């Protein structure tokens, strides 16, 4: 197409299996989109607010500058809250249009969001996310060296994916769904709650509270 309206991307794919974007991919894609007249939206619903550890926003890790940023989830720490930030140029385009949100600007939600931002800063949760993430990655890679069923350990901060396969040395096909489900359920007996994701549903998603 000669023109593109919008390029939307997660800096780290969340439900897709905690996959960091390949080095340079987003940057080059954004260049092409901009050249075709499009905008760049960074989806920070999962990566925002310090969860990557090394940076407050996922797009900062990539060295990109989005036109629009979507955010939610940890923004309210359990309280239903989401927001969209945008450049002045994009906002000016919306100004003449009729846009509204029935619950937009809810004062209780705004108070919750403000306190979350304060706690993230006051309790240094971004640094904690980095430290605990490094600890997780070290331990998980030690487990990977012992068990051939762990195909990959990846992520940053408290956004970590553990991909389960049949045998890392012989068969990288996804672990049998029944076996994966059995492990997934048994972890609950140890007080551990994982998410799961990936194209084949064979990735443990480790995204605990940043505190």
Per-segment meaning from a language model:
Residues 1-211:
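Conserved N-terminal phosphate-binding loop of PLP-dependent enzymes in the Aspartate aminotransferase
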